[in-house]
Amino acid sequence: CEEEYMDYVNKGCPMVLGGPLGHVMAAKAIAFKEANTPAYQAWAAQVVKNAQALAEALKSYDIPLQTGGTDNHLMLADVTVYGLTGKQAEAAMFECGITANANALPYDKNGAWWTSGVRLGTPALTTLGMNEEDMKEVASIVDFVLKNTKPGVTKEGKPAKGKIVISDETKAAARERVNKLLGAHVLYPELDLDFLKKEFVK
């Protein structure tokens, strides 16, 4: 800042600055600038289109969705149709390279920890450049993973709400499909992934 304001600025920031951290404010400034561009608005519109396409694709596999669909970036799927809790579905998908969150449904019989649902969203997929057609494959992979996952048991042989049984073959087949999808939509195409794997992955 200009010298005449320097003392005031330095006393106000960071001397008496509380919750809003400087780097957070800077990040917000950039985010607001980006949000005011046509490219961001096109991305946001595609996020919703992808979410609606994913919702319809999931329903084609008879996966119930809370509210029957979505008009934003996410959806809540009831995974009890597979005989799984939300935690089990989350764990199974994670082992196959899919990130989702266990999420309670209204009046959830499994409670807020184990849950009966999973939350799926499309912002990250859209950032990768995926479109509505790709959402059909995402839904197909989700269905494949969940229908090939069984609830695990405790040491006493009782059903466990958090443990799963999923074969190595299922995981390998799902990961192959996930990798194929990601290979067609590389986030940083300019990076030499083979070099990075060779140098940094042990």
Model-flagged regions — what are they?
Residues V16-G19, A35, A39, L54, ...:
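Short secondary-structure junctions and interdomain/linker hinges
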Residues A53, A57-Y61, Q88-C96, I141-V145:
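Generic non-transmembrane alpha-helical segments
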Residues K49, A112-K202:
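PLP-dependent enzyme catalytic core of the Aspartate aminotransferase-like
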Residues A45, A91, K136:
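Short alpha-helical basic/polar micro-motif
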Residues C1-T85, I166:
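Active-site C-terminal subdomain of aminotransferase-like
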Residues P64-E132, F195, E199-V201:
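Conserved PLP-binding catalytic core of the aspartate aminotransferase-like
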Residues C1-E2, I30, E34-T37, V81, ...:
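Short, well-ordered loop/turn and helix-capping segments at boundaries between secondary-structure elements
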Residues Y8, G12-V16, A42, V47, ...:
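Residue-level preference for alpha-helix termini and adjacent loops
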